[in-house]
From Swiss-Prot:
It comes from Shewanella oneidensis (strain ATCC 700550 / JCM 31522 / CIP 106686 / LMG 19005 / NCIMB 14063 / MR-1). The gene is rplR. Belongs to the universal ribosomal protein uL18 family. One of its GO terms (molecular function) is 5S rRNA binding. Disulfide bonds: none annotated. This is Large ribosomal subunit protein uL18. This is one of the proteins that bind and probably mediate the attachment of the 5S RNA into the large ribosomal subunit, where it forms part of the central protuberance. Keywords: Ribonucleoprotein, Ribosomal protein, RNA-binding, rRNA-binding. GO terms for biological process: translation. GO terms for cellular component: cytosolic large ribosomal subunit. Part of the 50S ribosomal subunit; part of the 5S rRNA/L5/L18/L25 subcomplex. Contacts the 5S and 23S rRNAs.
């Protein structure tokens, strides 16, 4: 089994457990160049989203693939979710290790007011 398949299996397993709880989830996806975050409700509708592809986020950054970019995305997605009335979420790391950019995004979202 290759690295990507292992990550996807971990992601599916964790996602099913979160769906059983029936709570909003903060989903993270990362590529070498960008990082994406979405808050999704139990009915699979996107409540809030932010990524380094967006102009509002990108213009504040020097690079889009580092920890500082992840912190900015975490802050933006948390602010947008709170505007929509979502404060409690489950963190769905999509099978990625809780380290580096994924951890930075989570910490920034917590500091901005999301609870998980």
């Amino acid at each position: 089994m290759d690295k990507k398949t292992s990550r996807l299996r971990r992601a599916i397993r964790a996602r099913k457990k979160i769906q059983e709880l029936g709570v909003n989830r903060l989903v993270v996806h990362r590529t070498p160049r960008h990082i994406y975050a979405q808050v999704i409700n139990p009915e699979a509708q996107v409540v809030a989203a932010a990524s380094t592809v967006e102009k509002a986020v990108k213009e504040q950054l020097k690079s889009t693939g580092n920890v500082d970019a992840a912190k900015a995305v975490g802050k933006f997605v948390a602010e947008r979710a709170i505007e929509k009335g979502v404060t409690n979420v489950a963190f769905d790391r999509s099978g990625f290790k809780y380290h580096g950019r994924v951890a930075a995004l989570a910490d920034a979202a917590r500091e901005a007011g999301l609870q998980f």
